[in-house]
């Protein structure tokens, strides 16, 4: 199955890139409103397909050990800043207050992969938080672990679905009104586990969610 995923990724990379390019070129033309909407929809779906293929490849490589992590003692501040900067435009577009508490904490982690895991958590938080809501990032150290929280004022997740949302392609009932492929949380948990950490959620319908990423300090 992993060989199949790799082959699919290789064969679809150029067609997807061409779709995105043509959609972007169309959107720059002086077209009727209906045609502009079609071009925007084409670009959105091509981007979604690109993200899905890339995510499948990443999870496949993580599961087989092909894509290795290189944990080292790292400052969390630049890692958090990297992840937050990537979702800031989306948050601003929805009028969501995105805040991050400065931290002097450090953890034994792979900075690149940790930023990827946090980006997935933040992207979901912004996606499922209504306009005008809040998303906050904060961290805290314990004796052996460092904890990074991504808290939102979004729709929340029923208790019966909280264990299922970390499964590949699973999407909670409340999530179907939003775009997504159901792989971000699975990938984030794989990244956490690959570094000797773990990921958990605390949530309730109508009360938002807090995803906590635990990473070893040494």
Give residue ranges: language-model regions.
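Short alpha-helical segment of the dimerization/phosphotransfer core of two-component systems
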Residues: 44-49
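Short helix-loop "hinge" at the ATP-lid/N-box region of the Bergerat-fold HATPase_c
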Residues: 125-126
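Acidic ATP/Mg2+-coordinating residue in the GHKL
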Residues: 152
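Conserved micro-motifs of the catalytic ATP-binding
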Residues: 64-69, 102, 106-109
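Short beta-strand/loop element within the Bergerat-fold HATPase_c
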Residues: 132-144
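Short conserved segment of the HATPase_c
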Residues: 157-170
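Conserved glycine-rich
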Residues: 196-198
């Amino acid at each position: 199955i992993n060989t199949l995923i790799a082959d699919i990724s290789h064969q679809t990379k150029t067609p997807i890139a061409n779709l995105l390019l043509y959609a972007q070129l169309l959107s720059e033309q002086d077209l009727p409103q209906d045609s502009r909407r079609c071009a925007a929809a084409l670009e959105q779906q091509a981007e979604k397909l690109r993200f899905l293929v890339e995510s499948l490849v990443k999870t496949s490589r993580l599961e087989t050990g092909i894509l290795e992590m290189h944990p080292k003692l790292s400052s969390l501040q630049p890692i958090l800043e990297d992840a937050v900067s990537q979702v800031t435009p989306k948050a601003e577009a929805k009028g969501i207050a995105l805040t991050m508490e400065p931290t002097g904490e450090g953890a034994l982690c792979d900075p690149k992969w940790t930023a990827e895991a946090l980006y997935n958590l933040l992207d979901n938080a912004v996606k499922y938080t209504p306009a005008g809501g809040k998303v906050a990032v904060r961290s805290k150290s314990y004796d052996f672990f460092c904890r990074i929280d991504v808290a939102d004022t979004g729709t929340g997740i029923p208790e019966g679905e909280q264990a299922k949302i970390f499964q590949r392609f699973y999407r909670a009932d409340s999530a179907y009104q939003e775009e997504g492929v159901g792989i971000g949380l699975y990938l984030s948990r794989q990244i956490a586990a690959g570094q000797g950490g773990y990921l958990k959620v605390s949530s309730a319908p109508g009360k938002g969610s807090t995803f906590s990423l635990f990473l070893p300090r040494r």
